[in-house]
Amino acid sequence: PYVLFAWQKLCEKETENISVNGELNTELLRSKLNTIKNLMFEKIDVWTEKLQEIFAECGVAFAIVHNFKGAPVQGFIKKSENGKNILCMTIRNGRADSFWFTLLHEIGHLLNGDLSTRFVDFSSVVSDAEAKADEFAMNSLIPVEQYLKFTRFCDYHNECEIHTFAQSVNV
């Protein structure tokens, strides 16, 4: 749809003046995952600036771009015409859980080498690359072994136990 194309163009415009350190450095990005995850607990003005710095260091121009009504988009990666790697996000519906999952999903695309294809993430897209990025995001937020242990041995309907578990996995 045209609204999606317009949002992508806005992303390109928002990131064109962001300086990055060369090409995408996936090893450095992978090493920054815990730092990125720890930003979940900061105020929005702190983590937006820190994310821009981290991504620029890893060779990616990062921006949070307001979403348009009718554009069911959460995140977007692209290698621009001038060769710059772009990662744009929305804060659609104001939900932190969606934002952080989608951010890690987009990082999964970057680490999986999916930059050769333009990826726009919205709910109707289903593919192997999307499934791999989803799995990466899930395991980055809550390691599967810990999740299975929690659901097997704890009362996952008990709010207190959920909070304790969330603290133990740093989410």
For the regions a language model picked out, list residue spans one by one:
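Short juxta-domain linker segments that transition from a proline/glycine-rich
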Residues: 1-171
